[in-house]
Regions:
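Long amphipathic alpha-helical segments used for membrane anchoring, targeting, substrate engagement
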Residues: 1-32, 82-105
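N-terminal intrinsically disordered, cationic/polar leader segments
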Residues: 28, 34-38, 42-54
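Alpha-helix boundary/capping detector
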Residues: 38-41, 52, 74, 98, ...
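A short acidic/small-residue loop/turn micro-motif
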Residues: 57-60
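Stable alpha-helical structural segments in soluble proteins, enriched in small hydrophobic residues
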Residues: 71, 75-86
């Protein structure tokens, strides 16, 4: 019984180490999304931090900035969605598909 427990603890420690490495890797990885035919491009990290926004000057309409605002929001959400999907796929590889307790992602 103690051998099983020791083996299980070792596996948990290995999984935790791999998860920490993944979190660092994701923090350094950039995800890009463009909308409006490239009018707006947003770059975020795997942790969701925005690294950059590129706006085609032709997309700027001083009389109606709401379209530009919507495109920025959409591009940001798309880039974050890509980052979240990548993180979920990598976490599934690490955990073997086991659900994680809340707060361990």
């Amino acid at each position: 019984m103690m051998r099983n427990m020791a083996g299980m603890m070792k596996k948990v420690q290995e999984m935790q180490s791999r998860m920490e490495a993944l979190q660092q890797e994701m923090a350094d990885t950039e995800f890009t999304a463009s909308v409006g035919g490239g009018a707006v491009t947003v770059i975020v990290t795997g942790k969701g931090e925005m690294r950059g926004v590129k706006i085609d000057p032709a997309a700027i309409d001083a009389d109606d900035v709401s379209i530009l605002e919507d495109m920025i929001c959409l591009a940001t959400n798309n880039a974050r969605g890509e980052a979240d999907s990548a993180m979920a796929a990598r976490m599934k590889d690490i955990t073997g598909g086991l659900p994680l307790p809340p707060g361990m992602s």
